[in-house]
Structure formats: C-alpha cells, structure tokens
Amino acid sequence: MSAFSVIVLILIGLAAGTLGGLVGVGGGIIMVPAMVYFLNSSQLQAQGTSLVVMMMPVGALGVYNYYTKGNLGNTDFKNAFIIALGFVFGSLIGSKLANSTLPILVIKKSFAVLMILVAIKMLFGK
C-alpha cells in the first residue's frame, strides 16, 4: 500500500469519526464515497470496510465521551435497544443482498439517492 493511500485512509477515518462524534451521522456516509472516489475501491469493498471500521470505535468511544460529560441521561436506551435489534437483522439482510443478488450499479445508485434525500431533508427540513 502506498504512503498516499495510507494518508487518504487516515483522513477518511478522521473525517468520518469527527462527523460521527459531532453530529451522530453514520460514518458510511463519509467513508464509502471517499473510498470509492479517492482509492478506487469497489462499492462492496467500501461498504464492507466501512462496517468493519464502525464495529467498535464509534459506539464504545462515543458512549464513553457522552458518559464522562454527564450527557448519557439524554440517551433513550429503550429506543436504542429496539433500533439495535432491527439494525442487527437489517445488517444481515442488507449484506446478504449486497453480496449475492443485487447488481452493483443498483447498490451504487441507491446509495447516491439515499445521500441526496438525506441532504435535502437536512437542508430544507425542520
């Protein structure tokens, strides 16, 4: 791996981690397009890499910082648990679809449309 690739990967991680900790966005919104665009990763490779990256650091360090600052009381643990249950099964279903039945172009375009819809909602929503 080239030094340039290592630097780009570190910058992608810094951007995704900073935004994840700052505003709670999923790191995949940053990491996936950055890996595809800057490192010529395939869509599936970028998605898989993003999932591995987010397994521990995002949750553990984010919760730790909220806890140490006394803001964990703002967390709705019941909702978090219910979402986590759906997330586990959704992740399993999504990864199976991505790795078996859906054409890569459909996945790539769907991801782009999702990002556009999220951006529009954030720009013009309440």
Question: Language-model features: where?
Answer:
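Membrane-embedded alpha-helical segments of transport systems
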Residues: 52-60, 89
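Small-residue hotspots at the loop-to-helix junctions and early N-terminal turns
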Residues: 47-51
